Amino acid sequence: LVRWMHVTQSKQQVESADRLGLITNMPAGDSEGDPKDRRFEQRLELMRDSMIYNRNNPSILFYESGNKGISEDHMKRMKTIYDQYDPHGGRVIGSREMLDPGSVAQYGGEMLYVNKSAGKPLWAHEYSRDEAARAYQDNFTPPFHIDAPDYNRNVESMAVEDVRRWWDYYQQRPGSGDRISAGGVKIGFTDSNSHFRGDNNYRRSGVIDAVRLEKDPWYVHQVMWDGWVNSDVPHTYIIGHWTYAAGVVKPIYVVSNGESVELFLNGKSLGKGERSSGFLYTFKDIAWQPGELKAVSTYADGRTSEYVLKTAGAPAAIRLTPHTGPRGLVADGADLMLVDVEVVDKAGQRVPTAFNAIHFKLDGAAIWKGGIAQMEGPADPAKKTSANGILATTLPVELGVNRVLIRSTTKAGKVTLNATADGLTSASINLASKPVAVKDGLLPVFAEDYQPSDLSRGPTPAGPSYTPFRRTIAVANIVAGSNSADAGKSHDDNETTAWSSDGTPENAWIEYDLAKAQAVSHLSLRLTGWRLRAYPIRITLDNKVVFEGVTPKSLGYVDLDMTPATGSKLRITLTGPTKDLDAFGNIVELKNNKEAQSVGADAVPTGWRLSVVEADITGPPQ
């Protein structure tokens, strides 16, 4: 799913998604709010016009009425437009937030937080907002930028955080019971010239940079996302590189969808990694030695996959690799050629520690559009006003690679690009741009007519695209130590309601009657104040303790694996007072205090109050 934000995407973007088979949303236009004046009338008009313009494009599945929750009356007015202009398009209309199952909004989901529903699709409209420049790999790689969460991370740190944040949603995926999360979209999938929070002057949340060179998080998401619902295509990826200075000792992170990962250095086993967040395997305190680092993943069915890193030698030469469209470089004045520039060792392997300055010289029927780079040191205050190397003819490689753009002219002819650097063997490319027919100043064909469509994944499965791994257990009745009239709000598939106890220790419990003895193994809880508040609790099943501990803070739900047992009455008891301390204090654009509506901590004081928004009781699948 690609989510466009705030403004209706261009027709080119819509049609590109059609060609690639990418599901997208379509926003109308908003300034992140719910205005009560003429501005909302304009939004309605824009939704109408955009819907008419794009309703025949199959990639659009969601009409987005706002990048923020809107009133139910405003949502009804948007739904009226949908009913009039696209009643049979097979799409849904909704808005960010809009969690109430009684709303006319046909989908919803908060920014960042994990939402679940048994009815409408709820998906996170933005997750993992952290930023990292592609140039900053880790603390031990030039330019030796020290990791500084959350908006000045190193790429290694950002990749690890992306695994942790996606795991929040993956645990609640289809197959986990009746109430599920529909997933989430990674905000800022590419670095962009937009609102930023780090020490640069552009947004660096992308898993690829501004010229579409991959960072480690690109490959991390490939591991986690390759499948219809489950990550079921074997992948293993070692974050980073294996070219360090003597004496470096650091953790090695491997991302894999296997059941175990073993690490080998020059053929010798370094043991198996410590698994966390489903996909992350950590190998602590690995001492660098030159050679080959290999990770081997083993799957439940005995299959294996592996990934290998090799130590690079000293920088020796420049390598240029051009990328053009299927027709080559077309002399239409708009076509682009992307050229990768790498610094390689004498064996041709990229040197991941190289930051050599490359001098470019372009001749012929083309226009230099250049690339992008950090250009300053990691602590340089000029970053905020930097031109980022835009249009510069001297650019450094970053971690051994960069990319530049060259635009064609309207005249066909030879194009030559030379790249030189001190102490390195130079490189050049030579090609000719191709003429195109022009009639009355217009082109009779368009570039998209020549773009291939990759359908190698095959059709959407005709049957279920997942295998249930948990089963929801029905609740017949709920009683509580206090406020029993509201106890049902803890199990009503509505994240806008909650039950809370009265603040006395003896009344801080709630009990779910399962009607008959059931095999229970798992409890998924959305607790009031979940990102601020930890709850010391005891869970019993027919008076037998199946869990006792403190709930972790989260971005929505805590998943508690209980001692498997069979019983008919599950009770949750608060065993100590609660207190608030934000576990995600640097998340900008989220209210970091108790007033955040979706957290609800402002309405329920700390202390001896157990407060449950939703309790999902599950057992093994039948």
Across the structure, where does each feature detected by a protein language model lie?
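Short flexible loop/turn segments that cap and initiate beta-strands
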Residues: 249, 257, 263-270, 307-308, ...
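Substrate-binding/catalytic cleft of secreted carbohydrate-active enzymes
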Residues: 3-217, 221, 230-242, 282
